[in-house]
């Protein structure tokens, strides 16, 4: 296929090359400051100037070359800044290890119960800087482990004050084992907190304006709460029903999950009936506008 006939595909190749360069060679390229916005901004400005200049002189080759470089760096930067640890407001740049931190957080999901503890993913917003005597905005979420039932204080649309020491999750030294720290990082979770009583996670206030994600979380929480408190089913059957309706499968027994794996129906737990119903309603609404 002649790429000259499809210039967009050739330019897309440069963009993809930038993404792959970050994935496989970020440790080599980062020290050379390729992530620096000033470099890409300068190249983009140069590209715009060359596009304007080509109307007066023949600069087709130069414009194409600069476009390739600009898209390569753009692809690299998009991946680079997806990693919150590269931001100046990253939570890791603000905390003091081995000291109790004050962090304003908000639930990202529902509470998960495992054995003798419960856990909750929370989104962090502000941290108190004792040296400066003020609150500072932060990026990077936290996984909270609790020895008491977090459901007793949980509200999906509320802000909390977390008072705890933050620890980085341990990474696997064996490259062939599951790396839990890397798994958490992909969910923007960089630190873990262990709390023992309710005073370490205090309710502050509810959020006044909700976006679609928060409305979805509230709906999910209400469905889970209804099944756990009102349905006369065994604990196993409740968890299966919750997983099928909401996609929340964290509390399913390993034996149940394996039975779904062996039957080839594990995807049913990932794409819940609730999600499918919402998608069906959306598609129906769109087509009703086209053909009433």
Which residue stretches match the model-derived regions?
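Short, function-defining helix-loop hinge/capping sites that tune catalysis or transport
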Residues: 26, 137, 280-283
């Amino acid at each position: 296929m002649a790429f000259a006939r499809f210039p967009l595909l050739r330019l897309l190749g440069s963009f993809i090359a930038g993404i792959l360069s970050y994935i496989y060679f970020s440790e080599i390229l980062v020290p050379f400051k390729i992530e620096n916005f000033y470099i890409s901004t300068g190249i983009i400005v140069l590209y715009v100037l060359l596009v304007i200049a080509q109307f007066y002189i023949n600069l087709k080759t130069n414009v194409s070359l600069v476009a390739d470089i600009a898209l390569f760096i753009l692809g690299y930067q998009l991946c680079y800044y997806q990693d919150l640890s590269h931001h100046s407001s990253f939570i890791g740049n603000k905390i003091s290890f081995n000291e109790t931190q004050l962090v304003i957080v908000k639930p990202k999901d529902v509470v998960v119960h495992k054995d003798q503890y419960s856990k909750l993913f929370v989104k962090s917003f502000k941290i108190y800087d004792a040296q400066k005597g003020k609150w500072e905005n932060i990026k990077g979420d936290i996984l909270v482990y609790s020895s008491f039932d977090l459901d007793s204080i949980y509200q999906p649309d509320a802000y909390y004050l977390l008072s705890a020491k933050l620890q980085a999750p341990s990474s696997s030294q064996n490259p062939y084992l599951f790396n839990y720290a890397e798994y958490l990082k992909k969910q923007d979770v960089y630190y873990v907190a262990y709390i023992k009583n309710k005073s370490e996670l205090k309710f502050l206030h509810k959020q006044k304006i909700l976006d679609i994600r928060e409305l979805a979380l509230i709906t999910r929480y209400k469905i889970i709460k209804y099944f756990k408190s009102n349905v006369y089913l065994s604990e196993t059957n409740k968890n299966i029903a919750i997983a099928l309706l909401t996609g929340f499968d964290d509390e399913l027994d390993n034996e149940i999950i394996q039975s779904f794996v062996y039957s080839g129906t594990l995807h049913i737990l990932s794409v819940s009936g609730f999600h499918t119903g919402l998608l069906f309603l959306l598609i129906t609404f769109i087509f009703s506008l086209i053909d009433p």
